[in-house]
Amino acid sequence: MLRWGGAGLARGLRAVRSAWLRGPRGLPLALVRSAGVPGARDRRAPAPGTQRGRALSLSAAAVVNSAPRPLQPYLRLMRLDKPIGTWLLYLPCTWSIGLAADPGCFPDWYMLSLFGTGAILMRGAGCTINDMWDRDFDKKVTRTANRPIAAGDISTFQSFVFLGGQLTLALGVLLCLNYYSIAMGAASLLLVVTYPLVKRITFWPQLALGLTFNWGALLGWSAVKGSCDPAVCLPLYFSGVMWTLIYDTIYAHQDKKDDALIGLKSTALLFQENTRQWLSGFGVAMVAALSLAGANNGQTVPYYAAVAAVGAHLAHQIYTVDIHRAEDCWDKFTSNRTVGMLLFLGIVLGNLCKEKTEEAKDAEAVRVGSEQTS
């Protein structure tokens, strides 16, 4: 009797073992796993914000999503997941640094990297200030309701502390410049702080943003040369302001319905169906100002070719944008990084086509000689 019972138990154990080895669908377990069939322990819901089987992405949003969870609200508050704003702040700095370079020479790479760091920090600080001012409005706008302060992921006190940290680091970058540039950079803080309030009192907040975002067109030149040359810097600054009026009006069309409901103002609400005509005027003014800046800087053919390409790109944006479709407005807005990079490339190539000054030739000869002797 015991022998028959033991035999039955042994057969049962063998059956269980065979079923386990063959996996949940009658296949060998090794084959099941290699084919990606989920086992019992694998059938958990994926973590929020992830999708099983998605290819590794190196986009800014993916990098932010992969950061430690406690840091993610702060990175989003800086808009590191949407770097287009940092590019639009940084590119006018590169134009100015490029125009200030010695004839026949590349721009100062140290200054470019320094201003790049400053652009990340000051864009983050500006977004923090903006979201602190607008936290009650952001809750009422579909596109901005999930911003960290509006959503309650970061408290007002935490945002103040974070803002202080960003401004402290930005001050460290600013102190690497000459005294003239330090004073000029400090003056821009007033624009950064007051810009978010402008949309409450005037239909021209995009103009205030242009004055703020293109400050680097003045600061870059002074950082290289020690002071501003009005003949070059002012037309360049004006062209940047016109550029901002174009791209930020397109951007503002995304939120025009919500803005109208909650009482915020913008050029999108002011221009409405006349947007193309207004933006065309801004585009012509931008191209004219860039041409004047180039003439006063002694620029060459590649620069003017780049200015023509910028004009063509802007014309395409203005006459193809669907101001009633938010997705198209966003696409046209983000394409302005290409505009800024085209102009920077034209500045660099145009400067390289200039004949080097005697001072630059002497400096290069000294550098080459020191490299050969070392």
From Swiss-Prot:
Annotated transit peptide: 1-34
Mitochondrial matrix side: 35-83, 130-148, 194-200, 252-277, 354-374
GO annotation terms (biological process): glycerol metabolic process; isoprenoid biosynthetic process; ubiquinone biosynthetic process
Pathway connected to this protein: Cofactor biosynthesis; ubiquinone biosynthesis
Main location: mitochondrion
Location in the cell: Mitochondrion inner membrane
Protein name listed in UniProt: 4-hydroxybenzoate polyprenyltransferase, mitochondrial
Residues annotated as transmembrane: 84-104, 109-129, 149-169, 173-193, 201-221, 231-251, 278-298, 333-353
Family: Belongs to the UbiA prenyltransferase family.
Side Mitochondrial intermembrane, residues: 105-108, 170-172, 222-230, 299-332
UniProt keyword annotation of Ribosomal protein present: no
